[in-house]
Structures are given as C-alpha cells and as structure tokens.
C-alpha cells in the first residue's frame, strides 16, 4: 500500500514473529493451530484499521513468517524479510531497526504499531498520530501501562526499546507518553484476559471469525 495523498506522511511498521512461536500464553484457551489462526487474524485486523488512516503513507511488515508475509501483501502492505540472525540478543528491536532503515527511503516520520491490536479503530490511530505530532518521539502504553502499543518518531531516530517493561524504557529514552483515550489502540493481546478485554471492546472481522472457529 502506498497512499500518495499530499498529507500522507507516515511510514507504519509492524513486526511479527513466527506464528508457531507467537502468543504461547494463550495456550490455556487456544490450541497451537488455533493460536496461529487467531494471531494471523489479529494482524489482518490491525493492518486493516491502519491502512484506512489518511496520514498513513505506507505499511511495512517485518517478519520471518511466510504466512504473515502473504497476509500482509494481500492487504497491500510491503514486507521485509526479518534479517535478524538466530540467537540475536534483542531480535524484536533489531527487526524494527532494519524496518526503520527500509521505510525511511520514503517516509521520515515513522510509527511502530503492535500487530496484535484486534480492537483497534482507525479513528484512535488517527487521533494518536495527531497528538504525536507535537513531539519528536512519543509512545502509547498498553492497557496495563507497562508495555508499548505504539511508538512515534517524527523526523528523528526511532530508538525502539520494546520488550518487557518497554513503557518505562521508552520514557527513560526521552519519548513523551501520550495519554489519550484510545482503548482499542492500547489492547494488545498477550493473555486470555487481554483477549477477553479486546472482545468486550469489539474485535475486527478476521479476529471474530478466527475466535468463532477455534
């Protein structure tokens, strides 16, 4: 997807690990096969919400997974094969840095979005982007306040600090915390409780179908 509108100035990056290794904490409620289906569906709904935001110029998915790559391409996203070598001490942030380099060819303003935001509404992301423009770097925490749902960098280096306790690490790196009321944007999925909370908000069609089929 490439939005050529004059005001479309955001390059959006989503990192996705191998589906077979994703969301193992959902094992109490979903089989391995169903977890893969739900994770892929959440990615589809996340991209689907993001690509309709007028400010988003391009979506780049960085992943080592063929299934995730195919799904992203069908939605019009670009795909970067994750170059992170096996055994890397910080694979997620390495993948994001590689994606940052790739997407800067067309956008100087970059947003990292979690790929498991099935309740994300386009208006929430649009509002968060508007708020983020007031700062060189900013972020939105997850609903627990400890993780990072989105990281924004306008004309400056991304400096991703994702992982456990990432909200505090992004705060310490100088990024400004955005405090808007964006429940869908904050509802990334790690646990069965997170999935229930997202369903209460209302998940996208792909996730709804995958959960119903599980």
Swiss-Prot record:
Enzyme class: transferase
Pathway as given in its UniProt record: Cofactor biosynthesis; coenzyme F420 biosynthesis
Lineage: superkingdom: Bacteria
Pfam families: CofC (PF01983)
Key words, A-Z: GTP-binding, Nucleotide-binding, Nucleotidyltransferase, Transferase
Enzyme Commission (EC) number: 2.7.7.105
GO function term, MF aspect, one: GTP binding
Reactions the enzyme catalyzes: phosphoenolpyruvate + GTP + H(+) = enolpyruvoyl-2-diphospho-5'-guanosine + diphosphate
GO terms, biological process: F420-0 metabolic process
Family, per entry: Belongs to the CofC family.
Name the UniProt record assigns to this protein: Phosphoenolpyruvate guanylyltransferase
Organism: Mycolicibacterium gilvum (strain PYR-GCK)
């Amino acid at each position: 997807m490439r939005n050529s509108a004059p005001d479309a100035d955001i390059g959006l990056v989503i990192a996705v690990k191998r589906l077979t290794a994703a969301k193992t904490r959902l094992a109490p409620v979903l089989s391995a096969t169903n977890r893969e289906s739900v994770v892929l569906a959440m990615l589809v709904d996340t991209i689907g919400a993001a690509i309709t935001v007028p400010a988003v110029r391009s979506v780049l998915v960085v992943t080592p997974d063929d299934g995730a790559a195919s799904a992203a391409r069908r939605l019009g996203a670009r795909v970067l094969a994750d170059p992170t070598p096996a055994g890397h001490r910080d694979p997620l942030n390495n993948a994001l840095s590689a994606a940052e380099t790739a997407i800067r060819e067309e956008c100087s303003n970059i947003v990292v979005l979690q790929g498991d935001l099935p309740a994300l509404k386009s208006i929430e992301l649009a509002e968060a982007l508007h708020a983020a423009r007031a700062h060189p770097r900013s972020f939105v925490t997850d609903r627990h306040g400890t993780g990072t749902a989105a990281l924004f960098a306008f004309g400056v280096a991304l400096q991703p600090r994702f992982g456990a306790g990432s909200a505090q690490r992004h705060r310490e790196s100088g990024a400004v915390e955005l405090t808007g009321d964006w429940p869908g944007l904050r509802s990334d999925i790690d646990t069965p409780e997170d999935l229930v909370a997202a369903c209460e908000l209302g998940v996208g069609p792909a996730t709804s179908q995958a959960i119903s089929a599980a």
